[in-house]
Amino acid sequence: MTERSFDSFEVVENGLTEEQILQNPDCLISSHDENHPANVICKLCEQFFHNNWCTGTGGGISIKDPKTNYLYIAPSGVQKEKMKREDLFVLNETGDKCLRKPSMYKPSACTPLFLACYKLRNAGAIIHTHSQHAVMCSLIFKDVFRISNIEQIKAIPSGKIDPVTNKQIALSFFDTLEIPIIENMAHEDQLIDSFHDIFKRWPHTQAIIVRRHGIFVWGSDINKAKIYNEAIDYLMELAVKMYQIGIPPDCGIGEEKRYLEMPM
């Protein structure tokens, strides 16, 4: 490849041939558009590091480019607050061909899990964090995280479709948010069977908690995935605090008084 500054590469557009990509794979990650997947992943990884969700190289993000359907994936072993566009992997739409790989890093062990979310959940983006709130909830709850009657629940879709607008119906204040919990394994790619099982038994879930590990959250695009992740983390933190003062997170409205009146 000829010597050129990184920002001088042309932005990839629909219709770019594989030969062109092969000659200049960095065109897939070069863009001044703040909404380009390469830029969004780097920005969010830094933000999630400062949120204490992706420290010590933990966690990851993958985004499907809505223009090309190429899959952008954060690598393994990179400090998230220092991630650069050059660090990213780019796969084709089906995930069976690597179009661009960094020189220094290995593929994320989460890659098979991300691909399963794209294929079986029609996801547009997946966020994986090592949130302490997720880990704490995985220790408090047995198989399913539950929290009820909290305003922030309304940020999460119910899985139901409005017959008039044909849009997702959100959970209501009076609903219970449920997120399945699976057991952790030695390596993240070994979680794939558990993911497939959850996809069959929980067709409408937007997240999976991995015990003593963290959480995976997905959405139809990165904006929705980010909203769901933030809302769920808020609810998990609240659930832990409720548990600490003796209130079941899924208790009914007004029932908290009964638990607060009980001797500690």
UniProtKB/Swiss-Prot annotation:
Binding site for Zn(2+): 128, 130, 213
GO molecular function: methylthioribulose 1-phosphate dehydratase activity; zinc ion binding
Family annotation (InterPro entries): Aldolase_II/adducin_N (IPR001303), Aldolase_II/adducin_N_sf (IPR036409), MethylthioRu-1-P_deHdtase_MtnB (IPR017714), Salvage_MtnB_euk (IPR027514)
Subcellular location: Cytoplasm
The UniProt record lists the keyword Amino-acid biosynthesis: yes
Annotated catalytic residues: 151
Purpose: Catalyzes the dehydration of methylthioribulose-1-phosphate (MTRu-1-P) into 2,3-diketo-5-methylthiopentyl-1-phosphate (DK-MTP-1-P).
Name of this protein: Methylthioribulose-1-phosphate dehydratase
Organism: Vanderwaltozyma polyspora (strain ATCC 22028 / DSM 70294 / BCRC 21397 / CBS 2163 / NBRC 10782 / NRRL Y-8283 / UCD 57-17) (Kluyveromyces polysporus)
Gene: MDE1
